């Protein structure tokens, strides 16, 4: 999320005079990126090889990480020549950025690595909607050239910090999320009895299939499908959306980013699970609770596109705007 003072240029605040001085003195450090590709799609291998070769020709060393089966990468005549890593923090440690070729699922897994190493992440869409991606595969070459030329900027996106506790207050697990944290019922034959809490005060109790707590970035994902509003990414807020709640009060809530949201389950209800960004999980026995706060560390988001979020929303969801005439001055 963009906040005052958090935007950087690609040289982390260095002005043109500083860059000229560094270039003249030969003091520039060696550049390296981590390239993450969804290898489950054959076409992605060729595009990843194209990107890796172009980055290397541009003077940037490349590491490669496969989110699915690593074997196709190892066997590939081009990608097999680069250093290969698994899903570990070390894969992104010390790199300039993580470049992701894939859909939103691949992006979220790569963001997990980038966040752990505190390095920026750039998404290039190879999926369908790909709302988290900054660029489309048709312009892959341009995106790579922009990285080589350091023609990008970085903005911070808000995250969530999650702690699950049992009935006695013991910590069951911790985690974080870029998109959302969902509390989901494990018993598909009944409802999950919960009570929603904001800033240590009860809001409402209800039976439901689950509760979603989302960032503005995640408001276009699972929360949107559950009937939540779209929040502009520049907004600092926490979004709460219930899933099939059995209550008259089931409207989405938008609360302060400084608030703590908690979802507590009834001791006699079903077990549940906390799912973060669709793939990190914490088991919740009956009577457990999950506490969600603003995360202390944002995700550093690489921006290439200068178009406003409104245009992005219209394009990604193919919203009809026929007949719009614009403001009159």
UniProtKB/Swiss-Prot annotation:
<protein>
    <recommendedName>
        <fullName>NAD kinase</fullName>
        <ecNumber>2.7.1.23</ecNumber>
    </recommendedName>
</protein>
<comment type="similarity">
    <text>Belongs to the NAD kinase family.</text>
</comment>
<comment type="function">
    <text>Involved in the regulation of the intracellular balance of NAD and NADP, and is a key enzyme in the biosynthesis of NADP. Catalyzes specifically the phosphorylation on 2'-hydroxyl of the adenosine moiety of NAD to yield NADP.</text>
</comment>
<dbReference type="InterPro" id="IPR002504">
    <property type="entry name" value="NADK"/>
</dbReference>
<dbReference type="GO" id="GO:0046872">
    <property type="term" value="F:metal ion binding"/>
</dbReference>
<keyword id="KW-0521">NADP</keyword>
<feature type="binding site">
    <location>
        <begin position="104"/>
        <end position="105"/>
    </location>
    <ligand>
        <name>NAD(+)</name>
    </ligand>
</feature>
<dbReference type="GO" id="GO:0003951">
    <property type="term" value="F:NAD+ kinase activity"/>
</dbReference>
<keyword id="KW-0520">NAD</keyword>
<keyword id="KW-0418">Kinase</keyword>
<dbReference type="Pfam" id="PF01513">
    <property type="entry name" value="NAD_kinase"/>
</dbReference>
<feature type="binding site">
    <location>
        <position position="209"/>
    </location>
    <ligand>
        <name>NAD(+)</name>
    </ligand>
</feature>
<feature type="binding site">
    <location>
        <begin position="179"/>
        <end position="180"/>
    </location>
    <ligand>
        <name>NAD(+)</name>
    </ligand>
</feature>
<keyword id="KW-0067">ATP-binding</keyword>
<keyword id="KW-0808">Transferase</keyword>
<feature type="region of interest" description="Disordered">
    <location>
        <begin position="1"/>
        <end position="26"/>
    </location>
</feature>
<dbReference type="InterPro" id="IPR016064">
    <property type="entry name" value="NAD/diacylglycerol_kinase_sf"/>
</dbReference>
<dbReference type="GO" id="GO:0019674">
    <property type="term" value="P:NAD metabolic process"/>
</dbReference>
<dbReference type="Pfam" id="PF20143">
    <property type="entry name" value="NAD_kinase_C"/>
</dbReference>
<keyword id="KW-0547">Nucleotide-binding</keyword>
<dbReference type="GO" id="GO:0005524">
    <property type="term" value="F:ATP binding"/>
</dbReference>
<dbReference type="InterPro" id="IPR017437">
    <property type="entry name" value="ATP-NAD_kinase_PpnK-typ_C"/>
</dbReference>
<dbReference type="GO" id="GO:0051287">
    <property type="term" value="F:NAD binding"/>
</dbReference>
<dbReference type="GO" id="GO:0006741">
    <property type="term" value="P:NADP biosynthetic process"/>
</dbReference>
<feature type="active site" description="Proton acceptor">
    <location>
        <position position="104"/>
    </location>
</feature>
<keyword id="KW-0963">Cytoplasm</keyword>
<feature type="binding site">
    <location>
        <position position="109"/>
    </location>
    <ligand>
        <name>NAD(+)</name>
    </ligand>
</feature>
<feature type="binding site">
    <location>
        <begin position="220"/>
        <end position="225"/>
    </location>
    <ligand>
        <name>NAD(+)</name>
    </ligand>
</feature>
<dbReference type="InterPro" id="IPR017438">
    <property type="entry name" value="ATP-NAD_kinase_N"/>
</dbReference>
<dbReference type="GO" id="GO:0005737">
    <property type="term" value="C:cytoplasm"/>
</dbReference>
């Amino acid at each position: 999320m963009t906040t005052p003072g958090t935007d950087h240029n690609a040289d982390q605040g260095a002005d043109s005079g500083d860059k000229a001085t560094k270039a003249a003195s030969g003091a520039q450090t060696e550049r390296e990126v981590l390239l993450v590709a969804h290898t489950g799609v054959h076409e992605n291998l060729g595009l990843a090889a194209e990107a890796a070769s172009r980055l290397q020709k541009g003077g940037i060393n490349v590491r490669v990480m496969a989110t699915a089966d690593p074997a196709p990468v190892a066997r590939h005549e081009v990608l097999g020549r680069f250093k290969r890593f698994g899903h570990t923090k070390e894969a992104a440690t010390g790199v300039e950025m993580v470049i992701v070729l894939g859909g939103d699922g691949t992006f979220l897994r790569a963001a997990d690595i980038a966040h752990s190493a505190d390095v920026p992440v750039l998404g290039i869409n190879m999926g369908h909607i790909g709302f988290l991606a900054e660029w489309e595969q048709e312009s892959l070459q341009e995106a790579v050239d922009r990285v080589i030329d350091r023609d990008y900027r970085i903005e911070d996106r808000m995250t969530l910090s999650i702690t699950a506790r049992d009935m006695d207050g013991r910590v069951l697990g911790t985690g974080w999320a870029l998109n959302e944290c969902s509390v989901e019922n494990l018993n598909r034959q009944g409802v999950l009895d919960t009570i929603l809490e904001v800033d240590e005060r009860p809001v409402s109790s209800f039976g439901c299939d689950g509760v979603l707590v989302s960032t503005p970035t995640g408001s276009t994902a699972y929360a949107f499908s559950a009937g939540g509003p779209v929040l502009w990414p520049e907004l600092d807020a926490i979004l709460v959306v219930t899933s099939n709640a059995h209550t008259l009060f089931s409207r989405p809530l938008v609360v302060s980013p400084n608030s703590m949201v908690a979802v507590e389950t009834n001791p006699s209800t079903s077990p549940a699970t906390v799912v973060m960004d669709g793939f990190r999980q914490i088991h919740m026995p009956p009577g457990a609770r999950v506490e969600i706060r603003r995360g202390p560390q944002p995700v550093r988001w690489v921006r290439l596109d200068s178009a406003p979020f409104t245009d992005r929303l219209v394009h990604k969801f193919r919203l009809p705007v026929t007949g719009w005439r614009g403001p009159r001055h």
